[in-house]
Amino acid sequence: MVKLTSIAAGVAAIAATASATTTLAQSDERVNLVELGVYVSDIRAHLAQYYSFQAAHPTETYPVEIAEAVFNYGDFTTMLTGIAPDQVTRMITGVPWYSSRLKPAISSALSKDGIYTIAN
């Protein structure tokens, strides 16, 4: 017969190894900061592509905080707080490589941080 303490110890071990998860609205600032972090990293990695896109779409504007974050290689997350969720969505989904590059990277980053999103 299995002792209750053995079962409790097993459950505790499983619980200790499981990642904590949080479910947040897509417009939550924590979600936005993860999205913007991926976005800034992608701009840094593909700067010429973003310059070409902006030249072809001059009416697409970006908050000054994005440019500051791209060229400031320190901790930039505090710079990005306060950008409206609808503006975050517009910037990120407005580039042609959103589905192929940004969306998978954002999903991966959110999952890594234990964040799952729900529609607003």
Curated annotation (Swiss-Prot):
One of its GO terms (molecular function) is structural constituent of cell wall. It is a single-pass membrane protein. GO terms for biological process: fungal-type cell wall organization. Keywords: Membrane, Transmembrane, Transmembrane helix. One of its GO terms (cellular component) is membrane. It is found in: Membrane. PROSITE patterns: SRP1_TIP1 (PS00724). It comes from the Eukaryota. The keyword Membrane applies. The chain crosses the membrane at residues 7-24. Belongs to the SRP1/TIP1 family. Seripauperin subfamily. This is Seripauperin-12. It comes from Saccharomyces cerevisiae (strain ATCC 204508 / S288c).
